[in-house]
Amino acid sequence: MSEDAIGQQVPAAQEAAAGAEPNSAARERHATLSRELTEHQYRYYVLDAPTISDAAFDEQLRELAALEAEFPALRTPDSPTQRVGGAFSTDFTPVAHAERMMSLDNAFSDEELAAWAERVERDAGGPVPYLCELKVDGLAINLTYERGRLVRAATRGDGRTGEDVTANVRSIQDVPGELTPSAEFPEIPDLLEVRGEIYFPVAGFADLNAGLVEQGRAPFANPRNAAAGSLRQKDPRITASRPLRLVVHGFGARRGWAPSTQSESYAALRTWGLPTSDRWRVVPGLAGVAEYVAHYAAHRHDVEHEIDGVVVKVDPVAIQGRLGSTSRAPRWAIAFKYPPEEVNTRLLDIDVNVGRTGRVTPFAVLEPVRVAGSTVALATLHNAREVERKGVLIGDTVVIRKAGDVIPEVLGPVVELRPPEARSFVMPSRCPCCGTPLAPAKEGDIDIRCPNTRSCPAQLRERVFHLAGRGAFDIEVLGYKGAAALLDAEIITDEGDLFTLDTAQLARSPFFVNKDGSLGSNAVKLLENLTVAKERELWRVLVALSIRHVGPTAAQALARHFRSVEAIDQAGEEELSAVDGVGPTIAASVREWFAVAWHREVVRKWAEAGVRMAEEAVAQGPRPLEGVTVVVTGTLAGYSRDQAAEAIQSRGGKVTGSVSKKTAFVVVGDNPGTKAEKAAGLKVPVLDEEGFQVLLDAGPEAARAVARVEG
């Protein structure tokens, strides 16, 4: 449930029917929705234990708002559509806000956002600048400062009266007990209500739940619940022990201070010692708003806290005053809500999957549910310890998250809905595919593995599928089904047999044969693909070997340095470790891999079949980027990520995934992530794609001349 999920956009056609008299069905539905929504608000605001997702709550609330728009007689002051938050009895002392804490109306589509902006600009008399900021999914808080000293902290409550949580808020490191005048803003207001959001960092959420489970206590379903539950503790020491953070995003009552714009107020609040976000932007019109919304839709998980949308505000305070407010929300601000990425569903079972390196991973079998544009029936649980840390039982209602193309993940259980028959997951002791006893690869490993690496059908199928991928041999027709077909027909014993396949062997599998018994086009294409794959670059061969920890970057470093599989095989661990981009872990993994006899047999078979096992001898070309470290972020029109990395590395440069003071350049394409922002903060030179080409063609000095340094 979102704290500002109430003021929905109501279609004009429904407003036109404002005089309609409600029938019995409408009254009954309105009563049911009001009762259910009130219960959900109580569970959300007071118990910190909601039993439905934000998306489900928003959907019910929109239905109620539509009913009241069609039948105004049903709308009453105590309707969930008219309440800002939860006016419920709690154990905390009630305290009145000097100025009401209002909520926000929502926009769920570009059209609704555009309609809001059109009304704003019509009523304002022309275009206005907008301030865009992230909508933090946390707990709303009101901090009252008198003559610069914190005297009270209160939750939102019903907007007029909240709960006094001053003692707990004082324990949060981000909250200053006293404001400090600055040169730019030397006068601290006599009275200042600061509005903000207390959140639980995503990075600490799993550890908190693990600790609660170890203590035999119920875990939180998500970071927002963790923030609310941590703040509303009777013992402030518990609050102090948890890594709660604050971000401020506005003000209420004030005396002795009149900022001209919202953005000016943020600058003042920051200089006085209050933590404002560094991600807000002022844009001149709706196009800028749309760009900001799109950017964080793609990068919402680059942020340290959970977000569920973007808040858009008219920046000039004078225009805010002219636009005014409804009974519950300002007309000068709106929350654009992203499609939900978290939903509740039932955990039907927990099964395990065996990967290409033998790792046995538990996964959740779910009651199918629609989230983030697709239907999800499976979600990762990582390992047995993670299942225990999350505190999920088979039969639980669980919160799942799906973010874009990321594998769906189980966040935690809704303990309040746990059925009596719920049961714990027990990790199998034997491989479900080949029956081999499972064990950690070495003492202390979290993961358990099937040691039957050569013959386990699951591992072999995954390895064949992997080596056919775009990052390895790029064998187009050898997908998951094709890999399984080769194994099912016992055409190959291991991946070493792949490059000696012929038509007679493929004809043994129904997958590669037409109904009339002739060889299928996929078989012909596979043999053609295999011929082409034999000439792939050495680094792709190394990736295809499924050596643990050796991905494209490490494989390219090894290929560039040693130039043949034989040289890599003969190199010692210390020599391998010294290669830039390799290091001790990868070096040890390479040595372990080549120490296995059947691994070396795969290499021998591929070499005899004509697979390229060495780079062609070439004269050492110029290395203009020797010693230059480059970070690439976003999408480039002329280069894939791998191609950009290869272009840098072939000229002697180094590609890393994080920005630091040692970074020479950050290359920024479309939809860059937080790396671009970090580059600005560290004043690292930034290149667009045209500048990147200058770097490749003319070297670092020429690139510095066309780079921009922000911050």
UniProtKB/Swiss-Prot annotation:
The keyword Magnesium applies. InterPro entries: BRCT_dom (IPR001357), BRCT_dom_sf (IPR036420), DisA/LigA_HHH (IPR041663), DNA_ligase (IPR001679), DNA_ligase_AS (IPR018239), DNA_ligase_CS (IPR033136), DNAligase_adenylation (IPR013839), DNAligase_N (IPR013840). Keywords: DNA damage, DNA repair, DNA replication, Ligase, Magnesium, Manganese, Metal-binding, NAD, Zinc. Residues 1-29 are annotated as: Disordered. The active site is at 135 (n6-amp-lysine intermediate). Its EC number is 6.5.1.2. DNA ligase that catalyzes the formation of phosphodiester linkages between 5'-phosphoryl and 3'-hydroxyl groups in double-stranded DNA using NAD as a coenzyme and as the energy source for the reaction. It is essential for DNA replication and repair of damaged DNA. HAMAP family: DNA_ligase_A. This is DNA ligase. It comes from Salinispora tropica (strain ATCC BAA-916 / DSM 44818 / JCM 13857 / NBRC 105044 / CNB-440).
